[in-house]
């Protein structure tokens, strides 16, 4: 018996008040639907089917990298109708697991428990008990605690509305059972929809075993219906991430002001992360790294004993051990800092390597530049790498000293141990071991007076 996962993702999401389909909104930097697919993949199913509707081709276009089979529900006729679109693609002997594209934090542990505790020919659901179950389907049990049916909120009688045990929507049974039960569904209800939950009563009527497992917490089965629910779930997720990192030896100064947006975030023990730090995509921080307040790191690796000072923005960079960056530095894609390099305040780098022990401390732009070891780049240095049509490279060899307010018009090379005088504009190579100055000689104009204002 193989496992086939069906993810229902056709909801219109009107309460999101957005032109973006609900399932494409991110939680922790990853679209809701992608999070559910990633969880499903951990169960090793032989197929994952996504039933989509609202957003149509836009959803497929944005998430076309996901290893799923896409099935369109052309009319929003309910969850039962949605599963009916996918079930023909399942083999009769398959165990089918039904998930929801807007329930992003369901855990593999809960799903494995559901699969393991549901009889091979039976039906199992994930339930939860909520203090306020408004709007959710209620679990109806007999006097012995056996599940009899699931009643949607809008169809529930007054005494049933007092029940706090709810249906999360997550369900498993065999494909053969679903192929038998789904055609029997009707839409005689307040919403005129075909409810998947009505299969529970059909199973009970047949004598099919119906069981359940309880969710570990309310948040893992929380659906996203509007932006406020998404915001609350986002903060819950970020607290989980902060707790996980803290227990692994990372100091998070304030978990309420920390954001991890991506699945591949690896942080070694003894790292300190100050407030309002955002980690996006693939981020690796080695031991004893210190991240100052208001820092953004995206797809970046930082070596041990390095400090990133406040208000720095770093994307797709490699920063090796014992470096210092910022405050107010910007490292753009392709930036590499070799061991012991230093980038100071208001320095911007792109496609540039700053060699071992080299430093650019103040007010500098370095683009398409290769800088060797132990180079000093003075304040106000600019590499002029763009001629209006093409980018050109600048090379600064080991030991060079670049004075303040220097413009290096690429392509050119500054030789080993060369010194460039302050205020120079270079458009040709500077030879090694020599002083190169390219500026007009200073003059004093005698007898000159400032103009005076006309009365």
UniProtKB/Swiss-Prot annotation:
Catalytic activity as recorded in UniProt: alpha-D-glucosamine 1-phosphate + acetyl-CoA = N-acetyl-alpha-D-glucosamine 1-phosphate + CoA + H(+); N-acetyl-alpha-D-glucosamine 1-phosphate + UTP + H(+) = UDP-N-acetyl-alpha-D-glucosamine + diphosphate
Active-site annotation: 362
Cofactor(s) required, per the database record: Mg(2+)
Listed binding positions for UDP-N-acetyl-alpha-D-glucosamine are 8-11, 22, 73, 78-79, 100-102, 137, 152, 167, 225, 332, 350, 365, 376
Coiled coil start-end: none
Q: Which GO terms describe its biological process?
A: cell morphogenesis; cell wall organization; lipid A biosynthetic process; peptidoglycan biosynthetic process; regulation of cell shape; UDP-N-acetylglucosamine biosynthetic process
Q: Where does Mg(2+) bind?
A: 102, 225
Q: What is its EC number?
A: 2.7.7.23, 2.3.1.157
Instruction: Give the residues the record marks as binding acetyl-CoA.
Output: 379, 385-386, 404, 422, 439
Q: Where in the cell is it found?
A: Cytoplasm
How does it associate, per the subunit comment?
Answer: Homotrimer.
Known role: Catalyzes the last two sequential reactions in the de novo biosynthetic pathway for UDP-N-acetylglucosamine (UDP-GlcNAc). The C-terminal domain catalyzes the transfer of acetyl group from acetyl coenzyme A to glucosamine-1-phosphate (GlcN-1-P) to produce N-acetylglucosamine-1-phosphate (GlcNAc-1-P), which is converted into UDP-GlcNAc by the transfer of uridine 5-monophosphate (from uridine 5-triphosphate), a reaction catalyzed by the N-terminal domain.
- Name assigned to this protein: Bifunctional protein GlmU
Q: Which organism is it from?
A: Coxiella burnetii (strain CbuG_Q212) (Coxiella burnetii (strain Q212))
């Amino acid at each position: 018996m193989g496992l086939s996962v069906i993810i229902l993702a056709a909801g219109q999401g009107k309460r999101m008040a957005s032109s973006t389909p609900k399932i494409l909104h991110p939680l922790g930097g990853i679209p809701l639907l992608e999070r559910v697919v990633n969880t499903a993949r951990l169960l090793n199913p032989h197929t994952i089917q996504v039933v989509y509707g609202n957003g149509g081709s836009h959803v497929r276009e944005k998430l076309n990298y996901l290893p799923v089979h896409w099935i369109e529900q052309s009319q929003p006729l309910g969850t039962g109708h949605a599963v009916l679109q996918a079930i023909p693609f399942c083999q009769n002997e398959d165990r089918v697991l039904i998930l929801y594209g807007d329930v992003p934090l369901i855990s593999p542990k809960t799903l494995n428990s559901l699969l393991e505790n549901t009889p091979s020919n039976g039906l199992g659901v994930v339930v939860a008990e909520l203090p306020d179950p408004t709007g959710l389907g209620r679990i109806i049990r007999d006097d012995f605690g056996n599940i009899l049916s699931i009643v949607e909120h809008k169809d529930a009688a007054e005494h049933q509305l007092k029940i706090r045990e709810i249906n999360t929507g997550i369900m498993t049974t065999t494909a053969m059972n679903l192929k038998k039960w789904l055609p029997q569904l009707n839409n005689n209800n307040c919403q005129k929809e075909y409810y998947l939950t009505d299969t529970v009563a059909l199973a009970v009527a047949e004598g099919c075993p119906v069981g359940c497992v309880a969710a570990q917490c309310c948040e893992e089965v929380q659906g996203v219906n509007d932006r406020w629910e998404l915001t609350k779930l986002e903060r819950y997720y970020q607290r989980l991430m902060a707790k996980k990192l803290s227990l692994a030896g990372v100091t998070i100064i304030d978990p309420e002001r920390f954001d991890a947006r991506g699945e591949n975030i690896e942080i070694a023990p003894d790292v300190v992360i100050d407030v309002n730090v955002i980690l996006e995509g693939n981020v690796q921080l080695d031991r004893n790294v210190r991240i100052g307040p208001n820092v953004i790191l995206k797809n970046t690796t930082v070596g041990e004993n390095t400090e990133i000072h406040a208000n720095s923005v770093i994307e797709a960079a490699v920063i090796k051990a014992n470096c210092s960056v910022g405050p107010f530095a910007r490292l753009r894609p392709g930036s590499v800092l070799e061991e012991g390099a230093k980038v100071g305040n208001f320095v911007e780098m792109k496609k540039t390597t700053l060699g071992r022990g080299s430093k650019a401390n103040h007010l500098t732009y370095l683009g398409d530049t290769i800088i060797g070891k132990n180079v000093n780049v003075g304040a106000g240095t600019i590499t002029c790498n763009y001629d209006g049509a093409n980018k050109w490279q600048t090379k600064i060899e080991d030991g060079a000293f670049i004075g303040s307010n220097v413009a290096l018009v690429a392509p050119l090379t500054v030789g080993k141990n060369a010194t460039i005088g302050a205020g120079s504009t270079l458009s040709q190579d500077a030879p090694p071991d020599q002083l190169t100055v390219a500026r007009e000689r200073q003059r004093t104009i005698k007898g000159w007076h400032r103009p005076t204002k006309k009365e």
